[in-house]
């Protein structure tokens, strides 16, 4: 068993709240996608607020800013969930459901197995990407870094570009 797991944050700003017709498709899929995440190979944890998701959490003063965080056993398990399982079909609606961001909206980083990242950790990883690009501390699927005991150059990957953080 690895001593490291991979953490992921994905943020977005919705054009309207839960009752807005423009984002109804997002909310209609939310429970199904979360249930799929919970049983996906390699799944360890996902951020949950008062309900079954993180929608009620307010990581910033903006009530339309949403955060999703998860931890998986390894980068391949996370990649397969995001890009190869049913989640990818839902992410195709991202342009309709979320405003375009001029900053990084997704970051990955390694955490010690058993540790869970905080919202502050996640927001700081996005800041690192915006200010310094991919590094061992925060990276993307396109510039993936190996686990800390084997840090070296980024491993270039080629996932669908419409669903990747900016850095």
Pin down the residues of each PLM region.
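Short S/T/G/P-rich N-terminal loop/turn motif that feeds into the first structured element of a domain
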Residues: 1-63, 104-167
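An amphipathic, aromatic/His-enriched active-site/gating alpha helix that lines ligand/cofactor pockets
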Residues: 62, 75-104
């Amino acid at each position: 068993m690895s001593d490291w797991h991979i953490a992921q944050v994905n943020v977005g700003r919705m054009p309207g709240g839960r009752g807005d017709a423009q984002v109804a498709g997002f909310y209609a899929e939310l429970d199904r996608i979360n249930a799929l995440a919970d049983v996906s190979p390699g799944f360890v944890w996902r951020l949950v607020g008062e309900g079954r998701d993180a929608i009620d959490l307010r990581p910033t003063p903006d009530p339309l800013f949403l955060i999703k965080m998860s931890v998986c056993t390894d980068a391949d398990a996370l990649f397969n969930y995001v890009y190869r399982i049913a989640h990818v079909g839902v992410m195709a609606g991202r342009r309709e459901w979320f405003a375009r961001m001029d900053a990084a909206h997704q970051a990955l980083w390694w955490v010690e197995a058993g540790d869970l990242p905080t919202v502050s950790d996640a927001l700081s990883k996005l800041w690192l990407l915006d200010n310094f690009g991919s590094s061992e501390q925060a990276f993307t699927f396109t510039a993936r870094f190996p686990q800390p005991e084997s840090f070296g150059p980024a491993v270039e990957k080629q996932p669908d570009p419409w669903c990747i953080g900016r850095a």
